[in-house]
UniProtKB/Swiss-Prot annotation:
Family: Belongs to the GGA protein family.
Protein name: Probable ADP-ribosylation factor-binding protein C25H2.16c
UniProt domain VHS: residue ranges: 15-151
UniProt organism field: Schizosaccharomyces pombe (strain 972 / ATCC 24843)
Lineage: Eukaryota, Fungi, Dikarya, Ascomycota, Taphrinomycotina
Keyword Protein transport: yes
GO cellular component: cytosol; Golgi apparatus; trans-Golgi network; trans-Golgi network membrane
Biological process according to GO: Golgi to endosome transport; Golgi to vacuole transport; protein transport to vacuole involved in ubiquitin-dependent protein catabolic process via the multivesicular body sorting pathway
Cell location: Golgi apparatus, trans-Golgi network
InterPro entries: ARF-binding, Clathrin_a/b/g-adaptin_app_Ig, Clathrin_app_Ig-like_sf, ENTH_VHS, GAE_dom, GAT_dom, GAT_sf, VHS_dom
Reported function: May play a role in the regulation of membrane traffic through the trans-Golgi network.
SUPFAM superfamilies cross-referenced by the UniProt entry: Clathrin adaptor appendage domain (SSF49348), ENTH/VHS domain (SSF48464), GAT-like domain (SSF89009)
GAT domain segment(s): 178-305
Amino acid sequence: MSSAKRRLYSLIQNATEPYAFEPDLAVNLDIADLINQTGGNLPREAAFAIVRKVNDRNPTVAYLALNLLDICVKNCGYAFRLQIASKEFLNELVRRFPERPPSRLNKIQVMILSLIEEWRKTICRVDRYKEDLGFIRDMHRLLSYKGYTFPEIDKENLAVLSQKSVLKTAEELEKEDREAMSAKLQELIRRGTPADLAEANKLMKVMAGYDTEQKQKYKEHVLVDLEKVKRKAALFGEMLNEVSESDKLASGDLYDELAYSLKAAQRKVDKILEEMSPEDDSYVTVSDLKSLIASLLTQYDHLLEGDFSSARTVAADNNSLLQATTESAKSNSKTSANASNTQSAMDLLIDLDIGSDAQSPSLPASSSQMPTSSFNMESLSQSLLGTVEAPAEVGAISLTESFNSPVSNSSPNVPINNFTSTCAFENSHLNFQITPKSKTRDQVVLLATYTNLSPYDTVENLQSFIAVPKKYNLVLQPQSGTNLSPLQKDGIYQEMIVTKLLDVTELPVRFKLTYKVNGRSQEYTGQSSIRLL
C-alpha cells in the first residue's frame, strides 16, 4: 500500500471516529487536498472508503462520513465526481434503503436524499463535464419512482456547487481537460469490459492529437468569455456615470459586487495577455480591455472617496477605451468568427452571467454515458433485483445491470439518431428536453419532449413558450397535448424548425413554462444551449 493511500485511510478513520460527534472541517479539507494532489486511483479509493463508512451501523460514523462526502464533492475535481456518479458507488450509497420508503426516514437516509438532490440540482446541471454524471439523475428518478421524497435544499448549499463558470486562460482549460480525460481513461481501463477498452482506445487517440486539434477551440472559448467581461465592464461604466453626489456607495451593494467581480477578472486578463503574443489578432483587444477595467476601478475608487471631479475625468477616458475595445474586436471578427457568433446569439437572449449554460470545450462523447432521454423507469423497476456488479449486500434500490448498457424504451415521438439530447429544465414534476431530429447546413429540426417525473401528481394545462435569437427564424408546431399523467415519459412533444443557422453548432434558446399541479399554477423561465452536433 502506498504512503498516500495509508495516509488517506488514516485521515478518513480520524474524520469518522464515533467519539468525535461533530465533523472536523480541518481533517475533511485535508482529505480533499490529498485527493486533489495525489490523483491516480486515490479518488476512487477515497469515494468507496467513505461510502463504506456511510453504511456503518453506528449512526455517528455514518453522519460524519456523509459530512466528509459533502466536503469532498464540493472541493474535489472531476476525478472524484466521476466516482460518485458511478452505478457502483450510488448503489452502495443507498444500500440501506428499502424498496418502499418507511413511514419515517432516519437522519442518515434524509442526509443521503439531500446530497443526491443537491448534486442533481447543481453539478448535474452546471458542471463542465455534466454528461458524465447522468447516473446521479437516474438514481434520483429511481428513488422518486419508488416513493421517496427529496427534501428542499437551502440556497446557500446550492450556491457552493452552482457557481458561475470563471474566466480561464486557454492553458488552464487545456490542463483541466487533460486531467479529466486522464481520470476517465483510468476508469475505463479499470472497468476493462470490451466496450470500455474500445472507448479507452478512442480516448487515447484523442489525447494524442489534442494539442493541435483543440487549441483553437480553447482560444475561441477564451474570447467568448472576454466578451462577457467587456459587457460587464460596459454595464459597470454606465452605472458609475449615473452616480450623483447625493448617492452613497456602500460595501456589499451592487456596485461593490461588480467591482469585486472585475478585480477578479482583471487578474485573469493579465494572465491571458501574458500567454498571448503581440502578433496575435486579439492582442490589442485584450490589452484595451485590461486598460478599461483598470480605469473603471479607478473611477469607482474616486466615487467611493467622494472625488466626483476626478471620477468625471476618468469617465471620459473610459468611453474612449470602451470604443477602442469595440473597434478592435470588430477588426478581429473574421479570425474569431465562431466565438463572436456564439456570443452575439447569447447576447440577444441571456443575462450578464451566462457562464453556467455556455458550453465549454469538453471531453469527447463516451459510450459509457447514459443520456437522460434513454432512461426508462418501467423497464428499470422490473429488474431492480437483477444482477448488479456491486457488493453482494446491495439492497433493494439499485440501478440496472451494465454500466455501459442503459435501458431504453424508444418512444415513437423521440428521434433515434446520433444527436445529443439537452435537458433544458427539470424539477420534481417536469423534465423538458430538446433533441435535434435532423440538420442541414442552415436548418435544424428540433423535438421538444416533456416527461412527468412525479409518481403521484398529474401535470395539467402545460404551455411552453420558446424563443431563439432574432437572427434566426423559428417555426413552432402545435404541442401534442397539455396534460401529463404520473410518470408519463415524453407524453407531450412539439416540433420546432430553426433556419438561417449557417453552420452553427450550438443554439441558445430561452423558454417559459406554465402548468398546474394539484390546482396550483406553476411558472418557470430559463435558458439553455442546444448542441446541434
